[in-house]
């Protein structure tokens, strides 16, 4: 799925966040582990790598709930994303300018403490901070959570733009199925930790079961997907 936007869909408790944390190797920090199967990144098994090693390989996760450093300014938050880079100040400054190009709101608020910015600006900051690591793949956990609809659309538009222009791969976990399928190339629907359906975004959007259970377009009485 390199160079694409892939959505993990499903309700609360479906296993979306756990899947992301398994990929980024943050699961071990919560005393979890992958007990079956393999996780491969360009042919390399990554289950035993540390989160820092994953970042070095270009995989960065944006956690649910934004998690900006409240006492730091927006720009200071962004620069923490470049902590592991070794390519010099000029390259980091160029990356910062690129982030500001994609997120002009952040340029305007660059000197503001993150605690005093809006939820949308904090989400943009969290994504921008991930981009400062020069990732090949970004894992986004519930990017729409707690945001006004117009801000959600703005965030997804930027994600799509980054994907198309910078060729960054996005794996996102999202409960807003309608929005996710509008911008994703393909998706997987999870229930109780299992994949119950997969396909292109167009295929999933037109599927009658998906319409009923996840897009709110059905009138059936069934209580589970399968």
Task: Identify the residue ranges that each predicted region occupies.
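Glycine-rich phosphate-binding loops of nucleotide-dependent enzymes
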Residues: 1-226
């Amino acid at each position: 799925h390199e160079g694409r936007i892939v959505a993990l869909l499903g309700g609360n408790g479906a296993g979306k966040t756990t899947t992301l944390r398994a990929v980024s190797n943050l699961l071990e920090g919560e005393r979890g582990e992958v007990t079956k199967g393999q996780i491969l990144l360009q042919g390399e098994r990554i289950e035993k790598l540390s989160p820092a090693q994953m970042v070095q390989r270009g995989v960065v996760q944006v956690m649910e709930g934004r998690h900006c450093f409240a006492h730091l300014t927006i720009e200071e938050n962004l620069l923490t994303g470049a902590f592991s880079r070794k390519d010099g100040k000029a390259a980091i400054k160029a990356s910062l300018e690129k982030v500001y190009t994609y997120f002009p709101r952040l340029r305007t608020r660059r000197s503001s403490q993150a605690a005093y910015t809006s939820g949308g600006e904090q989400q943009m900051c969290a994504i921008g901070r991930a981009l400062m690591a020069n990732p090949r793949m970004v894992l986004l956990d519930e990017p729409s959570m707690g945001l006004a609809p117009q801000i959600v659309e703005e965030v997804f538009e930027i994600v799509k733009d980054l994907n198309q222009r910078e060729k960054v791969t996005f794996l996102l976990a999202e409960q807003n199925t309608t929005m996710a399928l509008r911008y994703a190339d393909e998706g997987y629907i999870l229930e109780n930790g299992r994949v119950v359906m997969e396909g292109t975004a167009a295929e999933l959007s037109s599927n009658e079961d998906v319409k009923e259970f996840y897009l709110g377009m059905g009138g059936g009485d069934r209580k589970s997907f399968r």
